[in-house]
């Protein structure tokens, strides 16, 4: 969450007795990302990055998906959400929405630094549907002084070193820049801003270009079965640092990821391959073991450390921060895993080795550990 979006949320929720104004809430959906990126997928269809503590990369701050119709844009958040579940033992998230005349089946999967959202619409349409995708992208956690580049079928938002890319398996029909919250809107006690805006720019040419807000018009791959219409597309976003990845390599990678995962079967296969520990079928209360290991994988860094949780308070207004490894908590987790593995034989040797190496690397000269560290 950036300062602009935090102020907007504060004005919307400051009189709500049940929430903390300005926080990044993640209580109604679920998470994907067993590698370097951690992405929250809400039941309303939008997603947001919680990746910075794990990878040092800033990603999606806000997003929305909608379907263009003759009556305007129908936003997924306004549909009835029928279900949201993980697929099997994986971190592939399946969400089903009912839009009345059609249903939307959404699959979300985070692989490495790529997040994939596949949308499948099935039903009756008065006109060929188009996807509207709004993104507020924040490379290096920045919300201003950003560059926006349009490639043939990819939008690029960049700051200094970090670049965020978005594309779709079906390409992009159009790209519209968005005017960020203006000073008068920010300081107003009541005015809130909803995206996407109707206008695409400000009084100056650069107003809609030097920030990370953008709307994409994305065509669907449409098939008429005779009894119903099926429309599909896969939207992919990639975060990368030019110190590690060249721009062209990033452009190639995000395009290949979108096309390679444009079917449910491909997503399921990739999600299954991503799980590095398979819980034996005869494990007592296996479903609980799978859920616990999935949560720990979501919170794990490459170092073997675990952050306390997806950080809801990036400005440290209400807490001391969840995007850290707290040694007391992490060591207890490692001990419980060791005891559970000794009893159940799940096969967590690699996990435990990474934890031990992390403790050795961070131990101080006097034999103690700091209170907390970045993962």
Cite the ranges covered by each PLM segment.
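Terminal accessory carbohydrate-recognition/targeting modules of carbohydrate-active enzymes
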Residues: 1-283, 338-346
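Alpha-helical packing segments of well-folded alpha/beta enzyme cores
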Residues: 115-117, 288, 329, 355
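The feature captures the catalytic groove of carbohydrate-active enzymes
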Residues: 231-253, 309-326, 371-375
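Conserved oxyanion/phosphate-binding beta-strand-loop segments in alpha/beta enzyme cores
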Residues: 277-318
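Generic, well-ordered alpha-helical scaffold segments in large soluble proteins
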Residues: 291, 295-299, 336-337, 358, ...
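Helix-terminus loop motifs that line ligand-binding clefts
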Residues: 300-314, 342-375
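Well-ordered alpha-helical segments within folded domains of soluble proteins
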Residues: 323-341, 345, 349-353
